[in-house]
Amino acid sequence: MKFSLFFSVFFLAVLHACLSESEIDLEDEEHFMSSDSFLSEIQDESRGKTCIERNKECTNDRHGCCRGKIFKDKCTCVKNGKTEKCVCTQKKWAKIIESYIGDIPALPKPVDDKCVPKHADCSKRKDECCKGGIFKYQCKCYDMYDDDGEKTDLCGCVSPVEHQAIEGALRIAKKLIGDRWGR
């Protein structure tokens, strides 16, 4: 009896702690609501960089190689004594696939907010999310209640779980194929 009483009180205490909101929780929500999408700012900053063209040196910036028609070029390094030279190259399997498929039109970039980027607010334009890797992002909304009890929507362009799983599986397959045939 004492054992079950102890665990029931313990369970109620944990349940109360989980369901109660503190002032810190409310401040975090206000900060999230007031700040624009942090991830979109990072993405905008990274888009501003210029990429290194194919067959050019990439020793100082190994992740800055440009994209080919479909796949991103890789920085391949060769050690010559103590010095190391790196050049942006295209993997053999990527070259074969790109030559087989041919020209693929480039994905349209968001110009003048024609589409809503990932993790940005899409509450007013729910059908205008940009395209991700393979699939188009979808606008997902959550109900938020402020201190006055008024309901507002918090919406953002996100990738559904099933799309993330498919893209992840394709990334792994691409890596496995690249490790076997690309070197």
Swiss-Prot record:
Pfam families: Toxin_35 (PF10530). Residues 21-47 form a propeptide. One of its GO terms (cellular component) is other organism cell membrane. InterPro entries: Spider_toxin_CSTX_knottin, Spider_toxin_CSTX_Knottin_CS. One of its GO terms (biological process) is killing of cells of another organism. The keyword Cell division does not apply. Its main location: secreted. Disulfide bonds join 51-66, 58-75, 65-88, 77-86, 115-130, 122-139, 129-157, 141-155. A motif (Processing quadruplet motif) lies at residues 44-47. The keyword Lyase does not apply. One of its GO terms (molecular function) is toxin activity. Keywords: Amidation, Cytolysis, Disulfide bond, Knottin, Membrane, Neurotoxin, Secreted, Signal, Target cell membrane, Target membrane, Toxin, Transmembrane. Residues 164-177 are annotated as: Predicted alpha-helix. Cleavage of the propeptide depends on the processing quadruplet motif (XXXR, with at least one of X being E). Spider venom toxin that exhibits cytolytic activity by forming an alpha-helix across the membrane. Lethal to insect larvae. Causes instant paralysis and death in the larvae of the flesh fly (S.carnaria) at doses of 20 ug/g, at doses of less than 10 ug/g causes reversible paralysis. Has cytolytic activity against insect Sf9 cells. Causes stable and irreversible depolarization of fly muscle fibers, leading to contracture at higher toxin concentrations. Destabilizes membranes. The presence of 'disulfide through disulfide knots' structurally defines this protein as a knottin. This toxin contains 2 'disulfide through disulfide knots'. Belongs to the neurotoxin 19 (CSTX) family. Double-CSTX subfamily. This is DELTA-miturgitoxin-Cp1b. The lineage of its organism: Eukaryota, Metazoa, Ecdysozoa, Arthropoda, Chelicerata.
